[in-house]
Amino acid sequence: MQEESKILKFKFAVGEVFNDLRIKNENISINKLAMEYEIDKGSLSKIERGVYDCRLSTAWRIAQANGVSFSDFAKLLEEKLGKDFTFIDL
């Protein structure tokens, strides 16, 4: 898999996991989540759509805002990507 397509797959998976968490979090709106946890609404929307590659600190904050630890978010992301996903071809 080309590096660019791996990055796209990763960004879409991050967005899907965050969207799933937000929906499970009493179906909280992006606006409410952004306002309550001081996360930029536009960035949050772009992250959920998979068009923005967020910083690690932002991902951590979004995970916590959705009621999960960062490590649990990482596990969900790994499950979404599949065990054989890697950025580095060995």
Regions found by a protein language model. Give the residues of each.
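Short, conserved catalytic or interaction motifs in soluble domains
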Residues: 49
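A short, Lys/Arg-rich alpha-helix, primarily the initiator
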Residues: 1-27
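Short, charged recognition helix plus adjacent turn
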Residues: 1-5, 74-90
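Short alpha-helical DNA-recognition segment
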Residues: 25-46
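DNA major-groove recognition helix of helix-turn-helix/homeodomain DNA-binding modules
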Residues: 57-72
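The alpha-helix within a helix-turn-helix
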Residues: 22, 34, 63
